[in-house]
Amino acid sequence: MHPALGHPRALSSAPASFPPPPAAARLQPLFLRGGSSRGRRGSGDSSTSTSTSRGGCGGRRGGGGGSPSSSTGAEREDDDESISISKPLVPAAAALPGPPAQGGVPVSATAPAAASSTSTPTSSCSMTAADFGAGAAAGTVGGPGSRSAVGAGGTGTGGAASCCSCCCCCCGRPTRSGRRGRRRGCSPSPGCRWGYQALSVVLLLAQGGLLDLYLIAVTDLYWCSWIATDLVVVVGWAIFFAKNSRGRRGGPANSMHNHHQLHHHSAPPLHLSAAASAGAGAKARGGRGGSGGSGAGPGTTGAAGEFAFAYLAWLIYSIAFTPKVVLILGTSILDLIELRAPFGTTGFRLTMALSVPLLYSLVRAISEAGAPPGSAGPLLLQPQQHRAAGCFLGTCLDLLDSFTLVELMLDGRVPLPAHLRYLLIAVYFLTLASPVLWLYELNTATAAPSWGQTSGPGSCSRLLRLLGGCLVDVPLLALRSLLVVSYQQPLSIFMLKNLFFLGCRGLEALEGCWDRGSWVSPSRARSSYGAPPSAPPPPPPPPPQGGSQRGHLENEGGPHGYVNTLAVASQN
């Protein structure tokens, strides 16, 4: 497309009248005219003579000064001829005329700004179908709120372009500027994604290094094997984090797309009926990668496999941590630690207690890496992450219960026989390894735990929860009862905790057996971890009236088809 001839002209600083549209433009339909609806400023404001008269396409010419009033008639004829020759199929601003935005800036001057993220800046006034599709989806089709939001930052149905222009209205973070001044969408910061993973590795090294220090400095037993064990655990966790992020490499992109569609979706095309418009809006809100079943939300798809390999990582840690502590508690090394170590048994207690923040860092590292932007926090978690938080709190209470039993050995207040001492150590490490069960349960779950099904992930979840209660709470309650009866120990509040957890898990198992063969009602589905069933799909839109059925059938998807449909209808 050749630029118009004539001397370069700068922006005018004095009010000037605009030339009438040429005869070739008057013969075209209204939505194909370029520059028929050009805004004007008031008598006190200054106006532009180049960008506004070209329909807002940004045809600014650099060069020396010169006002539009000093241009000759030949130059204007050349300009008009150039406009009529290079007239695009759908102009940038005159596709759907509307009222000007606040401040006197016309819609034609602001429409290309909304579509600047998809179109490359050129010196011509043409606009492709993709550019119009982005601009129509962002501002024009969205309604009058979108047109006013572009110029004045207002809010409306289609105010997506203005919402993400400088910052995200959902997560509140400023967007990063891309190439040529474009704005990128919402994106999670790398620090939030990798912070808890780095903290997990630091806690692994700290706990393993302190235990190695106790074993090597006090007894000098197999120091190479202890250090090699720590290195194997750290490398295994690093491989777990790498495989977890690689397995969900496409997850953040789908989550970002669904997050953008959820908060910045535009209205469906104008030529669709009401039922089809509702279906298009539901599709925009539901996301592209969601499953069609119940509970398919924007964040559910990305969270389906986020706990993969987590149970293996914790199992490796439990296997490596157990022999070190058993060797210290079961031999005379504990007495040597009290005599030679800097902090004595207090430092050993703190080293054992690092398992709880390590488990917390593991759960948060998985949740932060898979969560969509703006969903961090205890009140905005996905169903699986709510389940993980509840299981973590239960495991913390179980570890605290078993650790108080181990402290009876450390203090020496109660003369326990050898078999009871080993039983206490076995119960402690059984409690330490219990997160493997619920991490595996979260891994085998699909989009969300389905409690109302007779087989599949729901039955597996009930079985694993009941098994975890029997393996942890029953031995702890039996040991507490034995200490109360045989060794005159006082009653502990942890006995009530064990009874409460056993009762809750038993009720869950009975509820699953009672509801066998029946689906969950919608009211119970809303109160449980699952999501309510989705509404039935809307009926297909009726065929359009008139002679443009062929254009609707061929070009029915998206703004591109909408533009081509308008062109076919105008030709008919």
From Swiss-Prot:
Keyword Phosphoprotein applies: yes
UniProt gene name: Tmem121b
Segments of skewed composition (Low complexity): 44-54, 88-123
Biased composition (Pro residues): 533-545
Residues bearing the modification Phosphoserine: 162, 165, 548
Family of this protein: Belongs to the TMEM121 family.
Pfam family, one: CECR6_TMEM121
Disordered: annotated span: 1-123, 525-572
Taxonomic path: Eukaryota, Metazoa, Chordata, Craniata, Vertebrata
Name this protein carries in UniProt: Transmembrane protein 121B
Bias (Gly residues) ranges: 55-67
Entry keyword set: Phosphoprotein
Organism of provenance: Mus musculus (Mouse)
